[in-house]
């Protein structure tokens, strides 16, 4: 009987997955997120390997490195050949920044790759070699995963790259100074980021490693949105929650994410300006809980898809601990907004940004009303 029940349960999971358009890759990525969250997205063994690598190659982690440093190591130490022309000749590959051909150790890098992307690509290749990882992906960005091991190894190499580009000790020291400021300004945050990298995503991702470990700020989330103006909808393409809090979270039912989120506003602002980067922040108060988050977001053009925009957001829960570690959270000048998760599940009645009716709440109200009337009838005929 037990195997029958287990099989029925598994079949149910697959039916739910199909209903919500979940793919094999979605399951792999969900498993990876669980692994990251279980470890507070901090992995000491990878951090130590980065320090070991830097020492072995006499790299000064107290200063910003450049792509030439990494290219020299790939070519001279690992026998790589770097080709900057081939990918540009194939229009079908304009969404790729690199392809590695293992048989000849040739790394094809797109000529459209900027220096921060090139450094990340090189750093990942160094990780695969230095950590002796062979079951790996060969394109950046990835096209498909054949196994969970490839998903995990891609994460390990990416973590190594982020830790190499943004060394933990230097970042922690800079963050302590930044958090001691009595007032918050986006200019100060931009300067902090510029001291390490030109890539907002690399910087925000790195914050999710060190904030839980070195500042005990574990109630945080990371979101990445994609947007194409012609389509008009926002796609949540990446998320991470260091603790299992409910909001904000991905929605697989094509509902409309709250337009009051700063991560959506920065994208909208970017589409209306000639700037290459829009940076903004707010304190988001969720209407269905008592939770408040300090959220900072960066929006840029999507480097991998023409005509698309993307935003990265980091949210830190405001509680007694975060208030004790981040001085500027006491400042009332940081704008506050009451937000929901999706329009379909939001009870804010006077929202000017609403783009869809609260049909989930309306359906719930109908069910409650029906249940109440049925109970009254049953009581009447007892």
Q: Model-flagged regions — what are they?
A:
Residues 1-382:
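Short juxta-domain linker segments that transition from a proline/glycine-rich
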């Amino acid at each position: 009987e037990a195997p029958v029940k287990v099989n029925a349960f598994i079949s149910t999971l697959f039916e739910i997955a199909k209903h919500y358009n979940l793919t094999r890759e979605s399951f792999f990525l969900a498993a990876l997120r669980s692994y990251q969250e279980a470890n507070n997205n901090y992995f000491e063994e990878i951090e130590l390997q980065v320090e070991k690598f830097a020492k072995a190659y006499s790299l000064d982690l107290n200063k910003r490195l450049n792509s030439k440093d990494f290219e020299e190591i790939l070519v001279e130490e690992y026998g790589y050949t770097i080709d900057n022309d081939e990918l540009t000749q194939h229009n079908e590959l304009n969404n790729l920044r690199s392809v590695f051909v293992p048989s000849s150790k040739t790394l094809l890098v797109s000529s459209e790759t900027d220096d921060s992307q090139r450094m990340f690509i090189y750093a990942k290749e160094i990780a695969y070699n230095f950590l002796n990882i062979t079951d790996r992906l060969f394109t950046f960005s990835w096209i498909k995963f054949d196994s969970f091991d490839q998903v995990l190894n891609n994460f390990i190499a990416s973590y190594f790259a982020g830790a190499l580009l943004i060394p933990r000790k230097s970042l922690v020291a800079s963050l302590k100074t930044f958090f001691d400021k009595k007032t918050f300004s986006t200019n100060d945050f931009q300067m902090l980021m510029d001291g390490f990298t030109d890539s907002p995503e690399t910087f925000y991702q790195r914050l999710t490693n060190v904030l839980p470990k070195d500042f005990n700020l574990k109630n945080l989330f990371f979101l990445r949105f994609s947007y194409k103006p012609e389509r008009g909808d926002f796609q949540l393409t990446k998320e991470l929650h260091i603790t299992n809090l409910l909001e904000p979270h991905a929605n697989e039912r094509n509902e409309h994410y709250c337009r009051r989120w700063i991560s959506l506003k920065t994208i909208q602002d970017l589409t209306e300006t000639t700037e290459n980067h829009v940076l903004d922040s707010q304190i988001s108060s969720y209407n269905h809980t008592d939770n408040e988050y300090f959220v900072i977001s960066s929006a840029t053009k999507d480097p991998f898809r023409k005509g698309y925009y993307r935003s990265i957001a980091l949210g830190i829960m405001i509680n007694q601990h975060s208030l004790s570690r981040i001085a500027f959270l006491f400042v009332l000048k940081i704008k506050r907004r009451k937000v929901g998760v999706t329009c379909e599940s939001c009870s804010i009645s006077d929202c000017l940004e609403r783009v869809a009716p609260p049909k989930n709440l309306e359906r719930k109200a109908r069910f409650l009303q029906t249940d109440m009337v049925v109970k009254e009838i049953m009581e009447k005929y007892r």
